[in-house]
């Protein structure tokens, strides 16, 4: 990236692109007091960069939910325990009793007819090493396909089925 393209200016923050294909750190945004202009600019940055990161935000659970609601109605993930006080927040923790399955390559809730815009992750405790979350820009991946491959796959439809992934968590055996 050239020195000129190091930061993209918005009115409420600066965006520092992280790679040519994906991601930007949004610097100077205060997520504890969002307003319509901040939501509009973050939404615009999200569409442009596909993944955005905010450092040094001191959001509590309620502020996290309020920020997320600024982008629309929140959905309750099927893996959320029924007795959780804030079902819109899915707690992901790893330790001796919880190994997790989200380290497998996935895209959140793609089985929905209209998947959500995205997920808003808030790291509370991170390990000294690891703890990485990986992202991919599928628009760039498609654009880089050959014309012959695009012609071959255009018009195809995929069926994403929740049953296999969540059958064990939901107390059911997956169907073959």
Question: What function would you assign to each model-found segment?
Answer:
Residues 1-176:
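Non-heme Fe(II) oxygenase catalytic core, chiefly the N-lobe of the double-stranded beta-helix
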């Amino acid at each position: 990236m050239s020195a000129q393209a190091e930061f993209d200016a918005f009115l409420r923050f600066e965006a520092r692109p992280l790679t040519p294909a994906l991601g930007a750190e949004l610097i100077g945004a205060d997520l504890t007091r969002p307003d319509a202009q901040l939501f509009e600019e973050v939404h615009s940055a999200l569409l442009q960069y596909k993944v955005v990161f905010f450092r040094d935000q001191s959001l509590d659970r309620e502020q996290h939910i309020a920020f997320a609601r600024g982008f629309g109605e929140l959905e309750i993930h099927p893996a959320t325990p029924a007795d959780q006080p804030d079902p819109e927040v899915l707690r992901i923790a790893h330790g001796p009793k919880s190994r997790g399955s989200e380290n497998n390559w996935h895209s959140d809730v793609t089985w929905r007819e209209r998947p959500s815009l995205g997920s808003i992750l808030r790291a509370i405790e991170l390990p000294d090493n690891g703890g990485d979350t990986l992202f991919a820009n599928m628009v760039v991946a498609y654009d880089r396909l050959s014309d012959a491959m695009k012609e071959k796959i255009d018009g195809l439809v995929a069926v994403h089925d929740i049953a296999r992934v969540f059958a064990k968590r939901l107390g059911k055996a997956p169907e073959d």
